[in-house]
């Protein structure tokens, strides 16, 4: 059985909704300190604020790039990543160009990821880059290809979902993604992880990071009504 301490260090404590306020971000950071979560995941505009709140802690600031559709230009994604790292982000979760992947334009998808990896790690080589493939929109073949491209581009993690699509992480998808990347990358499960039991299932399937807005409920052994 995985200990609750170990699970806490796998959680990206997440708040990405449009209505999040500075007070909400402050609460998120306080909870992260209380439960010793791995990171807080916030929208880019809140990165400087969260970085300031967490500057004397071990908790990282994670943010999202090209979120949630992945449909901004590569240049914009690269700038967004660079700006976020300059302002204190130590982890960036980027969304792939889903339409390009589905159209078989793999070189485009690869370059998109590469540019973000380069922009982020160019500012700070220790930055962790996670690639959101948005599994709910992909066939198994597309999921495999997306994972392969992420690894080729130098990403550290592949991530299931934004939490804003039609579905979140499933045990089957986490297994498939882990099988595909092997030891070359890690897997982050996100979307719909609302309980301690959900967390354990994802970890057993191969996830080493969990994106959830239900971190506190998970640690308290409750079931949360949160969507992400």
From Swiss-Prot:
Any single Gene Ontology cellular-component annotation: cytoplasm
Active site residues according to the UniProt entry: 93, 159, 188
Catalysed reaction equations from the record: 2-deoxy-D-ribose 5-phosphate = D-glyceraldehyde 3-phosphate + acetaldehyde
Protein name: Deoxyribose-phosphate aldolase
NCBIfam families: deoC
Gene Ontology MF annotations: deoxyribose-phosphate aldolase activity
Principal location listed in the UniProt entry: cytoplasm
Function: Catalyzes a reversible aldol reaction between acetaldehyde and D-glyceraldehyde 3-phosphate to generate 2-deoxy-D-ribose 5-phosphate.
EC number, UniProt record: 4.1.2.4
InterPro entries for this protein: Aldolase_TIM, DeoC, DeoC/FbaB/LacD_aldolase, DeoC_typeI
PANTHER family xref list: DEOXYRIBOSE-PHOSPHATE ALDOLASE
Pathway this chain belongs to: Carbohydrate degradation; 2-deoxy-D-ribose 1-phosphate degradation; D-glyceraldehyde 3-phosphate and acetaldehyde from 2-deoxy-alpha-D-ribose 1-phosphate: step 2/2
Assigned keywords, A-Z: Cytoplasm, Lyase, Schiff base
Compartments it resides in: Cytoplasm
UniProt-listed HAMAP family: DeoC_type1
Family: Belongs to the DeoC/FbaB aldolase family. DeoC type 1 subfamily.
CDD domains registered for this protein in UniProt: DeoC
Lineage summary: Bacteria, Bacillati, Bacillota, Clostridia, Thermoanaerobacterales
Pfam families given in the database record: DeoC
EC class (word): lyase
């Amino acid at each position: 059985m995985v200990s609750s301490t170990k699970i806490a260090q796998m959680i990206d404590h997440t708040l990405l909704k449009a209505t999040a306020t500075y007070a909400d971000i402050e609460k998120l950071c306080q909870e992260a300190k209380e439960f010793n979560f791995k990171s807080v995941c916030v929208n880019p505009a809140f990165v400087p604020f969260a970085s300031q709140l967490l500057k004397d802690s071990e908790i990282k600031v994670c943010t999202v790039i090209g979120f949630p559709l992945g449909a901004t230009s590569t240049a914009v994604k690269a700038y967004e990543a660079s700006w976020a790292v300059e302002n204190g982000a130590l982890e960036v979760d980027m969304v792939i160009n889903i339409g390009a992947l589905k159209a078989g334009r793999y070189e485009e998808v690869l370059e998109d990821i590469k540019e973000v990896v380069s922009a982020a790690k160019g500012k700070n080589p220790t930055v962790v880059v996670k690639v959101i493939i948005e599994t709910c929109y992909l066939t198994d073949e597309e999921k495999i290809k997306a994972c392969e491209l992420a690894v080729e581009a130098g990403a550290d993690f592949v991530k299931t979902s934004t939490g804003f699509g039609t579905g979140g992480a499933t045990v089957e998808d986490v297994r498939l993604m882990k099988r595909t990347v092997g030891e070359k990358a890690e897997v982050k499960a996100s979307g719909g992880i609302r309980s301690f039991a959900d967390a354990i299932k994802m970890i057993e399937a191969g996830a080493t990071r969990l994106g959830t807005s239900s971190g506190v409920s998970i640690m308290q052994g409750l079931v949360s009504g949160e969507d992400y």
